[in-house]
Amino acid sequence: DAKLAESPQELEAFLRVFVEAGVDCLHCSQRRFWEAEFEAVDGMDGLNLAGWAKKLTGLPTITVGSVGLSTEFTGAFRGESSKTRPLTDVIERLERGEFDMVGVGRALLQDPFWAQKIFAGNFEDLSDYDAAALKTLY
């Protein structure tokens, strides 16, 4: 899998350029937000890319990567669908401050009312992702 850096030290050096340039928030996209960025350092349940970026820079971060879905985005370009995935882990990580915001992609393409359903607590009304959503205009 593609990674920006092989270690926290490499990531810190990469991010330093942005911090010194005055960036005030980092949007940290990875294919599956729930995966640890440096598993060898802090285990399978370790910080994701946004968590490490926040830890290393002190800046607010946005996590994104298959939020609410079970497979990564590249399958959508091959016409593959994706089942919904519970939001428990993203909520827990957000509440403990691992990252500050959450970006959502395909789940919103599938259902433009996704955020309203989440806000209302209607998780059971969330839809699986169908690649045809890429061709749908609401």
Show where each model-derived region lies:
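Flavin-dependent oxidoreductase catalytic cores
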Residues: 1-138
